[in-house]
Amino acid sequence: MFKNLCDKIMTQKILITSALPYANGPLHFGHIAGAYLPADCYARFQRLMKKDVLYICGSDEYGIAITLSADLAGRTPQEHVDLFHHINQSFFEQLQISFDHYSRTTWKGHVEPTHQFFNDLLQNGYIEERTTDQLYSEKDQKFLADRYVVGTCPRCGFENARGDECPCCGASYEATELKNPRSKLTDASLILRPTKHWFLLLEKFKKPLMEWLETKNWKPNVINFIRGYIDHLHARAITRDMKWGISVPLPDSEGKVLYVWFDAPIGYISATKEWALLRGEEKLWEKYWLDPETKLVNFIGKDNIPFHASIFPAMIMGQNQPYKLVDELPANEFYNLEGKQFSKSDGWYIDLEDFFKHYTSDQIRYAIASNAPETSDSEFTWKDFQLRCNSDLLGKYGNLVNRVLVFIHNQCQGKVPESGVLEEQDRKFLKNIQDLVDQAAASYSTFKVRKASQIMMELSQLGNVYFDSKKPWQDAKNDYTKGRMHTTLNCCMECLKALALISFPIIPTAASKVWQFLGFQTPLEQEDWNRVKIEKLPLNQKILTPQILFQRVENEAVEREILKLQQLSLTKEKKSTPQSTQISISENILLKPLVDIEDFRKLDLRVGKIIQANPVPKSKKLFQLLVDIGIEKRIVVAGVAEFYKVEDLIGKNVVVVANLKPANLMGVTSQGMLLAAKGEGNLKLISIEDVAPGSLVS
């Protein structure tokens, strides 16, 4: 019975997916830190644990944004996605992301499972047809989706509001609510015209989703977010009026395609089917997707939580195939760059192609892993990158490997020496090694890559301290102490073996080299974690001459990279200056005539203290704030959710327009407005310290 249980555990199937990257541009470091490096570390570890691992990903290639970008670039949508599919696939290879298969949603086999989902959901009563008014361009002779539309915000009157949300006040709305809507491409006026679409009735899944969620022990940030999201589930359109996408499988649906968020997660299934076909075993995919004993792990960024924790599970519940529901959902927070969000449009990013001309995949993998955004946002800085590379990889890890192996080559003819009688310090050292190996395994298995990277360096430092304290160079001077030297070096070799093992998921190139230096013929990736952990190094095994594992990152290189980043950002800013200046003149002079002092005096500006802050349901931009303005406490809805965390707002003194007429924003009545300064990609509330709530501002 015990053997059967062990066999079941050892052969457990683990299906790992990373969120499909959108083939609308090249990847950047922020993407890698969220869904790809953590997944790859987990996959590599579980393979070492001899689990039946299948790691699947692919390009997400449909959607309105693709057609918009392709139009602007003068390419067809297919040419556009072909370009970025291959660029991103190449980046993944350079980063050594070990997908078992990397697919794409434009491959013909993706259509069948997508249609199967739609037909099942329709027949089971979870999809219904509705006719709604949508914005239509008579000039272009087509309906325009949100991304193609601009107009006047129905809330604050800003004239360049986007089709789904206002960048000025943060309000979310339907594109049909815009005043004076016009085409983003041609500036042509738009009219409302009825059109038919199909809606997924997500509200029908609230109860089963909540019951299913109760069985999960996910990160608190995931559970807390998705509970609120499920509470507000409602019917969502799953079709669009366009040509680029998966067709709607109904006879009266010409010119309609399935919305990208509907078909994209089905790409996990179609990619697995393609993998099986390429192996010549057409039904092999069923072993993973249709077996309830399979462990399904979806690695995503936090912006994908709604789709993977509610919408796609609802789609699976509503169709007829016994597909696996996700078991684990490691959702990471955002990874920023030098204090700001990565932004290609703002020139605030690191070009991966350029990066690989100067640095290695191990360097960036370790730098990201050691500061992974697992529970809160984190950031990449060039100074920190230099510190991680020089102090950790070179100074601790590389130094230990080099000094031990060079010493053995010089004193032991390049062979693993025999250990003598262990002293208490030796036994403690070897036990600490085993403990750290176990801790690393626990960290990898629970998606704690950051902790695993710390353990890796703790083991490196443990070996360095032991080597220094035992002073084998002194024992080498006398024949009667060489036995002691051999014992020290044998223990150090055990440390290097363990170090190669636990570091392989994070820095596979360096770890594999260390493994080869130790004289092993079998590639490390094919080894068994538990066997390597307990087996001793063979006596007299011939070791290889060590090579340099890591290069130093010089100050000049860091200064060059920071300057390059600043220049790229400045170039982007200059290119946008003419348009920005034109908009500024239009908004600040033409739209806002001069006022006299009496008009200004009509405003009641007061200091308010924020005492509560809560996200507004169904809005990414808005917070509902409870503000003390001295004479009373008021609800104020503010579009600051992108720029402030709840804890940053509590207790903050702000300036409130206290006599503004109440306005309804996303179902919440706002009794005022906060003053803020808004720059390119940033917003700061006007704050006044050390002044009592209710104080007048003039």
Swiss-Prot record:
Belongs to the class-I aminoacyl-tRNA synthetase family. MetG type 1 subfamily. One of its GO terms (biological process) is methionyl-tRNA aminoacylation. The keyword Metal-binding applies. Its EC number is 6.1.1.10. Homodimer. Binds 1 zinc ion per subunit. GO terms for molecular function: ATP binding; metal ion binding; methionine-tRNA ligase activity; tRNA binding. This is Methionine--tRNA ligase. Signal peptide: none annotated. Zn(2+) binds at C153, C156, C166, C169. A motif ('HIGH' region) lies at residues 21-31. It catalyses: tRNA(Met) + L-methionine + ATP = L-methionyl-tRNA(Met) + AMP + diphosphate. Its cofactor is Zn(2+). A motif ('KMSKS' region) lies at residues 341-345. It comes from Protochlamydia amoebophila (strain UWE25). Its main location: cytoplasm. Pfam families: Anticodon_3 (PF19303), tRNA-synt_1g (PF09334), tRNA_bind (PF01588). ATP binds at K344. It is found in: Cytoplasm. Residues 599-698 form the tRNA-binding domain. Keywords: Aminoacyl-tRNA synthetase, ATP-binding, Cytoplasm, Ligase, Metal-binding, Nucleotide-binding, Protein biosynthesis, RNA-binding, tRNA-binding, Zinc.
